[in-house]
């Protein structure tokens, strides 16, 4: 587990995406990623504008947005990212052969490679998925892009553990610049081989322990102390009866204090 500061890691990181993210985390004093699963552009933009000051990263499932358009959804989203200084992570979870994911990432309705700083992929189809996604990014935009591999999940009964997780780590090693880290529940090592992977952890809650659909929550202190760099929080920020401003600052503060404790 890394006890170096975000700023120290940013200065040495081989990925411009990871370096930018680590720097803005240091500047804003936040390691909070907001996961906003809402159905309309209006809901999304309103929540993003409210939570923007507290987050380093916005996680989208863009295919949930019923009225999606590049001009109506993506352009104002990017303006808000600039206004509040956060980055965008489209949680697409690619899981096909290289040529197919290349097209899925760059083409179709969503054109993800054009606007998402970061996306993610399963390791189930092998290292070709990394190659395909990287090619799509290079052919689509001059802006740097980063990929997270899904090493572990927070849902009950997940098959992503043991040999599967280790195999995914080996796939990540095939591209030091493009693969910036993992969706995982703990540190994934690699430092002795020269890797500095960012660990982003979903299933983080200060109040709830889970839901009826198999989600399992862990506390902020627990995930950061076991190696998480970025806490991913969804309904805890904006569910019914919650004030996103209050919860945004609450989770930002909890995440930052846990990080400072880890660095001591």
UniProtKB/Swiss-Prot annotation:
It catalyses: orotidine 5'-phosphate + H(+) = UMP + CO2. Substrate binds at residues 37, 59-61, 91-100, 217, 235. Disulfide bonds: none annotated. Transmembrane segments: none annotated. Belongs to the OMP decarboxylase family. It comes from the Eukaryota. The lineage of its organism: Eukaryota, Fungi, Dikarya, Ascomycota, Saccharomycotina. NCBIfam families: pyrF (TIGR01740). The active site is at 93 (proton donor). The keyword Nucleotide-binding does not apply. Pathway: Pyrimidine metabolism; UMP biosynthesis via de novo pathway; UMP from orotate: step 2/2. SUPFAM superfamilies: Ribulose-phoshate binding barrel. The keyword Lyase applies. Keywords: Decarboxylase, Lyase, Pyrimidine biosynthesis. This is Orotidine 5'-phosphate decarboxylase. GO terms for cellular component: cytosol. Its EC number is 4.1.1.23. GO terms for biological process: 'de novo' pyrimidine nucleobase biosynthetic process; 'de novo' UMP biosynthetic process. PROSITE patterns: OMPDECASE. It holds the Pfam family OMPdecase. One of its GO terms (molecular function) is orotidine-5'-phosphate decarboxylase activity.
